[in-house]
Amino acid sequence: MEMPREGDYIAIQSYKHNGTLHRNWRDTMVVKTEQNIIIGVNDRTLITEEDGRKWISREPAIVYFHRKLWFNVIAMLRPDGVAYYANLASPFILDREALKYIDYDLDIKVFPDGEKRLLDADEYAMNKKRWHYSEEIDSILRSTSFELLDWIDQKKGPFARKFVQIWYERYNQLRPDLDRSFFKGRENEERKILGT
């Protein structure tokens, strides 16, 4: 399938290794595409969980997906700064329905103060056994977790200081009907968010 264009809206679907739909984000605006990368923004979007529960996200988020990397990143714009949620996951595929990937349970959360925390190791161990993750997948995910920590420490890709500002501003340019900006009039908050 052809890559979406900037300004297009796509759905994002997260699956588990056994093929069940884990989570669906209804509207994500694409703000950048490259051969292997999609960057999008969702802002108060409808999210549907695997059990049918629905909720609306509280804050804007910049999402980063790569066709060759075994992780994706969500940068959440919060009043106290940017928090990152990095999912260890399969590279994405794209079809007419949605951008899709397999969520492999492990996550690394980066708090606005820079603290990093590995999440859901118990869920990973349980699902690895239950769904028979191969040694190859286990090895890929282990090496990817170190690669991801390097990206975080080196402020690479979605963890770069200006990443959030650049792509959130692009989102606002593509949505001229909105008379608001997360950064507008919030210079002190902006400095805090960007770590400057």
Swiss-Prot record:
Ordered alphabetically, the record's keywords are: Hydrolase, Magnesium, Metal-binding
Report which reactions are catalysed by this protein.
Answer: a ribonucleoside 5'-triphosphate + H2O = a ribonucleoside 5'-diphosphate + phosphate + H(+); a ribonucleoside 5'-diphosphate + H2O = a ribonucleoside 5'-phosphate + phosphate + H(+)
Do the record's keywords include Hydrolase? yes
> E.C. number, please?
3.6.1.15, 3.6.1.6
Q: Which SUPFAM superfamilies match?
A: FomD-like
* Active-site annotation: R23 (proton donor)
Name of the protein this chain belongs to? Nucleoside triphosphate/diphosphate phosphatase
Source organism per UniProt: Lactobacillus johnsonii (strain CNCM I-12250 / La1 / NCC 533)
